[in-house]
Amino acid sequence: MSFEQQLISWRRELHQNPELSLQEVATTARIRDWLQSGGLTLLPFDLKTGLVAEVGSGDKVIALRADIDALPIEEATGLPYRSQNEGVMHACGHDIHTSVMLGAALLLKEREAELPGRVGILFQPAEENFGGAKTLIRAGALEDVSAIFGMHNEPGLPVGEFATRGGAFYANVDRFVFKVTGKGAHAARPHEGKDAILLASQLVTVLQSVASREVNTLDSVVLSVTRIQGGNTWNVLPESVELEGTLRTHSSEVQQRVKARVSEIAAGFASAFGAQIDVFWYAGPTALVNDARWADFASDVAAQAGYRTHHADLHLGGEDFAVYLQHIPGAFVSIGSASEYGLHHPAFNPDERLIAPAAHYFAQLAEQALQHI
């Protein structure tokens, strides 16, 4: 079996056996077995899921990171190696990322004697719930590390294309929940109640004006309501309704201004309708900010490796690789996966031809980065 065939085989085994965040027990066991069969050293961190391998010796240390968890999505690809776990799918390509870094680890192991330092390869759990990076950092995965690199497959780019940027790349992620409390009533006698559904509906509409009319159009911001829940029958106005959604920004100043304005609007609506609106915010990862030097370096190495390189657009998705970059410099990059369907879609099907070239790229990137720290 060729190197490429081996990586694709591993990817398909991971794809058939996806596991949700913090449940990646079998995934971790598979990765451990594959790494140990390749002679890799595993660091003795106290982790329930996920693991860290290391190649090389010396004081200089570079890290590579892959995420290993899947999503609660029922797969609809029809592939012969489709998910065997009902309602769970690698719909974000973390099986691809893991296979790439497994390949990079094996390539680095072959050149271990020539490496001018050490490379840590982080197989991180729980990216989808934004907790895994903190778990690895607490375990000590960044100890002595000077720079870190990671990737995401990009379905909108053809295979063989690469993009990154210095500075802000991915967004701040905030989740919000509004609990709108009015007064229940018979549907035929709405005047006897305070219609929480009507209030919630108007609130959804007005919230859109914050992003479109109160923020500079040059600033990136998305405010999306993604869930409305209230009532359980057709002839009763419910007492309460919940709204849930997300705010995405790149600037912390815009983030705080929008959050404050949303709370003001909620308070104003509550007063005007004689109702109560409680607003709860839950912080996800902060904006992912690439180190400009390392982003340029990663792009230069990609060009050497034969990729067609691009300056990436700003991305409003969330990515907890941002947490690593709050501690040490590094760069996150996009590598084309040419899928007709996008990330988190039940028919998402990335092109496996990206895996082996990306493995060679990250091995080359790590080795050259060691020479520049």
Segments predicted by a language model, with ranges:
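Divalent metal-coordination and catalytic microenvironments
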Residues: L14, A53, L64, H94, ...
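General structural feature for long, well-ordered alpha-helical segments within catalytic domains
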Residues: F3-W10, Q23, T27-W34, K60, ...
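Active-site beta-loop-alpha junctions enriched in small/polar residues
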Residues: E19, D67-D69, A126, E154, ...
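Non-cysteine beta-strand/loop elements that form the S-adenosyl-L-methionine
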Residues: A63-R65, F176, F332-A338
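Histidine/acidic-residue-rich, glycine-tolerant segments that coordinate divalent metal ions
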Residues: L51-V52, L71-I73, L79-M89, I96, ...
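Metal-dependent amide/peptide-bond hydrolase catalytic core
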Residues: S201-I373
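Acidic/His- and Gly-rich active-site-bordering loop/insert found
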Residues: M1-H90, D95, S99, L106-L115
